[in-house]
């Protein structure tokens, strides 16, 4: 992948930064994207009179994060038209309508979109469709930072991660903790952890962990892990129901968030698992404990539960669907999964009144030293066979120590 300050800045501030650059990267991006956006605009009103229809088609059909007209709002109509004119290119007629305003407008009535008549009209969705990406444009965040935000909606707290790949750091945990605290304080119905991104969360930001090693600040790392664990316990022990709505990848620390919620409402396109062993680490946000509890609940056999947890965590097993997640004890019978992600936020909000808080659990009965030695022997044999690396063995020994 090409890395540059320009591309890093574009990811943070939007595509307009890239397109306004007159270097080779910017010129290439402009040449390609301007053609696509002009073509999209030329389809109105022949294909549809509503720009939102084209944006939806590109997002749902081609997995775009933003549609053409949402991108044009980010780029700026005036800049886009001026540059087309400067290059002697044809400006689609629809772009010349109501030049002073964006295609999308957030009002007290809800999100509106510009029509070919030059007048805004409400975006209408079926009753079951609720998108946070649209909803939040009409709401004010109760608390927000660069990586996460939370909103109050329908007497509920809705938490959104919005960092790159929704990687978690201290800022993410601050918002999550504040949402749970404020929801209890205000007497809200509960907390929903959700976002409209491609992935729920790809785990803890390894860059922030790496930084601790590079500057030899191990206390900072300890403080972060303590903050992570305490936030997970705060969610689990809250008097209010906490529901997670995973889509795409929920792995590593992102899956630890899911594990500590009272109910999981997953998309059929969900990938879950504790994958830290794949990068030579151990899950440190409480995930090991939760997986061990889940296997005990599922099997009622402490030795087999410990062995299954050892294999799950040590091998970094992934569930590539909710059905696989159930087999790996990643989800409970009370959890559910749904095909249409546009319905999931509404389902989660409705479920808050029906969710049963996970009761206080008895301490786990651990299997002890003999079982630990059996796991160490398994690791040694597989190291000799060349199936594990020496560091795999090191990680595996620590996982075995935890689950026994």
Question: Which residues make up each language-model segment?
Answer:
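N-terminal glycine-rich phosphate-binding loop for ADP-containing cofactors
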Residues: 1-191, 195-198, 207-227, 233-239, ...
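Short alpha-helical segment that forms part of, or immediately flanks, the ligand-binding pocket
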Residues: 256
């Amino acid at each position: 992948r090409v890395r540059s300050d320009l591309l890093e800045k574009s990811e943070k501030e939007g595509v307009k930064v890239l397109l306004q650059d007159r270097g080779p990267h910017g010129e290439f991006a402009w040449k390609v994207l301007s053609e696509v956006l002009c073509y999209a605009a030329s389809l109105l009103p022949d294909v549809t009179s509503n720009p939102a229809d084209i944006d939806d088609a590109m997002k749902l059909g081609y997995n775009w994060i933003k549609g053409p007209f949402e991108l044009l709002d980010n780029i700026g109509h005036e800049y886009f038209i001026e540059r087309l004119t400067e290059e002697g290119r044809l400006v689609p007629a629809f772009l010349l309508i109501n030049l002073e305003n964006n295609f999308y407008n957030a009002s007290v009535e809800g999100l509106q979109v510009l029509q070919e008549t030059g007048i805004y009209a409400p975006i209408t969705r079926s009753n079951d469709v609720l998108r946070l990406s649209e909803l939040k444009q009409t709401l004010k965040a109760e608390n927000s930072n660069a990586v996460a935000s939370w909103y109050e909606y329908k007497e509920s707290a809705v938490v959104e991660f919005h960092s790159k790949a929704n990687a978690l750091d201290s800022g993410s945990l601050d918002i999550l903790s504040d949402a749970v605290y404020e929801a209890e304080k205000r007497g809200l119905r509960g907390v929903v952890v959700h976002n409209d991104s491609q992935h729920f969360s790809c785990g803890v930001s390894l860059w922030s962990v790496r930084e601790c090693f590079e500057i030899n600040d191990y206390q900072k790392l300890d403080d972060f892990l303590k903050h992570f664990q305490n936030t997970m316990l705060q969610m689990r022990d809250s008097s209010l129901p906490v529901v997670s709505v995973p889509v795409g990848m929920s792995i590593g620390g992102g899956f630890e968030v899911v594990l500590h919620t009272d109910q999981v409402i997953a998309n059929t396109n969900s990938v879950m698992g504790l994958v830290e062993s794949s990068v030579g680490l151990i899950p440190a946000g409480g995930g090991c404990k939760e997986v061990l509890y889940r296997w005990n609940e599922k099997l009622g056999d402490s030795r087999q539960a410990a062995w299954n947890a050892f294999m799950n965590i040590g091998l970094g097993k992934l569930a590539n669907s909710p059905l696989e997640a159930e087999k790996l004890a990643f989800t409970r019978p009370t959890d559910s999964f749904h095909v249409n992600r546009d319905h999931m936020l509404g389902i989660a909000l409705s479920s808050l009144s029906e969710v049963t808080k996970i009761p206080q659990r008895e301490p786990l009965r651990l299997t002890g030293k003999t079982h630990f030695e059996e796991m160490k022997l398994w690791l040694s044999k597989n190291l000799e066979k060349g199936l594990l690396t020496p560091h795999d063995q090191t990680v595996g020994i620590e996982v075995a120590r935890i689950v026994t």
